[in-house]
Amino acid sequence: MSIFFSNPPWWGGKESRKGWFKRKRWRRGIRAGSRWPFTSLNKSRPDKRHIKDYTPYPYFLGYATTYAQRKIGKNHVFFRDSIGLSESYKSYFNFLDTIKNKIEYFLLESATPSWEHDYKLIKEIKGKYPHFKIIIAGSIGSVPEKLQHCKEIHAILKGEYEKNTLKVLNGEKGIIDYDLLTLDEMNQSPTPYFDDLHFDKYFDWNPVPMSKYFPQAHIWGSRGCPFKCIFCVWPASMTGNDPDGDKKRTVRQYTKEYMKNFIGTLIEKYKYQTIFFDDDTFNIGNKHTVDMCEIMNEFKIPWFAMCRADSIRKETWKIMHDSGCQGVKIGVESGNQYVVDKIVNKHLDLNYTKEIVQYIKSLGMSVHGTFTYGLPGETKANMLETKKYISEVKFTTVQESGTAEIEGAPLYNLNKKDLSVYPAAKIDSEYTRHADGSKKWMDLVESLQNK
């Protein structure tokens, strides 16, 4: 048996954006590695990668690759991140031609924003290589009824897919239900896939000054998040099974020993200049956070992390700084406390967040604040309050996006049922459903400008 773990190309057409730039640029999709797959106009173009276009590491795909390699042998497992490579469709199919006789199973991770594109590609792949058994993973697997008419699909995997991939390789097909790694299994599993072709293909601009360091290693120190934000996809559909937000969610953290060996190997082999912990929430609890700081203090390179404002003691931020952390991303979502509590269900005190952001900055670290607009039940006035909050807090940098509605997250189910965990979330005439947060944001910008 043999399997190809693929993150295929995802290109749109060439466009220009009024008020931004006149030269047409390619619309490029980001799929595996992104919690909310989206498209945007990039400097990259087919077969010509721009080194500083945002590109995340495809985490689930990378872990599943090495897990399969351990079980069935490296010679029977293939990996290719065509988005990281900025590969054209022509080059992608040329590569498939070189391995077609070695491949039995073909795995693609997908989600609603990319599914229309991906299914067309799957039909083309199946037409050219009819012996391929197509496996679909990713958040799209949480709603298998959307895929059951697709005769080209051999198996649909729910959740993170190391163990479920092996079930298919051992003969199972159809819908494969959740089977997550236990904490012990996770810490005994191999580290994710890196090689000489892909190691320098991942990049993020923020938090500053991360963009000045290259190459960047994007990694996880944990899986999952105990919080239940309405729009968050992975904790609800990949590292857990909680589409309505009414079940207990947990975080599984990698051990200090696992992470020390992992990071040490990456730095030694690929000479990474910085580490970005792209966890759902890196700093859940002081012990794990301090453990990671002790590791990074040994390696003496700058690092960055995806954090929450209130999940560690105040003094732990200084420990992070002293171990080389130069910046963090903090999800705030809205500048209106009612929206944060009753729609998002984040329960993050905005006044405390303002205080902690100023403290983090006083240490010499940057803070990249992330906000979302167009939540169900959110008013235009609420959105303008978010704008005001951003101006008052003075984050180093800010990310503003439209709220993406992607399968697996509670937001996706809101139009089907009332969800008690999100009492103020409602589908009304003000709410716009959209799976691509980038495109939704551009529509909202025009709307807010007219207020």
Spans of model-derived segments:
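C-terminal accessory regions of radical SAM enzymes
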Residues: 2-55, 218, 366, 381-451
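Short, solvent-exposed turn/loop segments enriched in Gly/Ser/Thr/Pro and often Arg
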Residues: 83-84, 140, 280-285, 308-309, ...
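Radical SAM [4Fe-4S] cluster-binding motif and immediate context
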Residues: 195-367, 388
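Acidic, low-complexity intrinsically disordered segments
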Residues: 2-262, 269
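Catalytic cores of alpha/beta
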Residues: 145-151, 316, 377-391
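Aromatic/hydrophobic pocket-lining residues that form the small-molecule binding cavity
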Residues: 61, 118, 165, 259, ...
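Conserved strand-turn element in the central/C-terminal portion of the radical SAM core barrel
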Residues: 84-87, 335-345, 357-382, 402-407, ...
